[in-house]
Amino acid sequence: MPPRSLTLSRLPVAALGLPFSSCSPPPPRLRFPFAARRARSLATRASSSSPDSSFGSRMEDSVKRTLADNPVVIYSKSWCSYSMEVKALFKRIGVQPHVIELDQLGAQGPQLQKVLERLTGQSTVPNVFIGGKHIGGCTDTVKLHRKGELATMLSELDIDVNNS
């Protein structure tokens, strides 16, 4: 009997070694060293140029306004299972968060995600804020809910919660 070979389509997903802790696609890999140096050079110039940095600060101001105007904010991607889980949790407890779907913002989505990473240190979605305070992602939000701390945080903002 010939030895069995695994094709990629039959290979278990876990065997691919893909990280499932985030909903961010991996960064592209550059094949040639000179391309990597050029990309770093362009990134450095872009981050130091005034139009980009003023655009970034405008986006940062926009994020801060959104957080100030809404007691519960979720930065999400519509296709992300972790984002779906967090949105379903808030729905179960009867809370309507202000949801911003980064994947539906066109070119501004990835830029906004970079601004969020600068502000929070978290590069993945969902990015959950309560009362303007960053509480983390899906795992953090679910843990707070299980410990009863999520309901406490929401009640401090005069938000009624169904105990589900």
From Swiss-Prot:
The keyword Metal-binding applies. GO terms for cellular component: cytoplasm. It is found in: Cytoplasm. PROSITE patterns: GLUTAREDOXIN_2. Its main location: cytoplasm. GO terms for biological process: cellular response to oxidative stress. CDD domains: GRX_GRXh_1_2_like (cd03419). [2Fe-2S] cluster binds at residue 80. Keywords: 2Fe-2S, Cytoplasm, Iron, Iron-sulfur, Metal-binding, Redox-active center. Gene3D superfamilies: Glutaredoxin. GO terms for molecular function: 2 iron, 2 sulfur cluster binding; glutathione disulfide oxidoreductase activity; metal ion binding. The keyword Cell inner membrane does not apply. May only reduce GSH-thiol disulfides, but not protein disulfides. PANTHER family: GLUTAREDOXIN 2, GLUTAREDOXIN-1-RELATED. This is Monothiol glutaredoxin-S10. The gene is GRXS10.
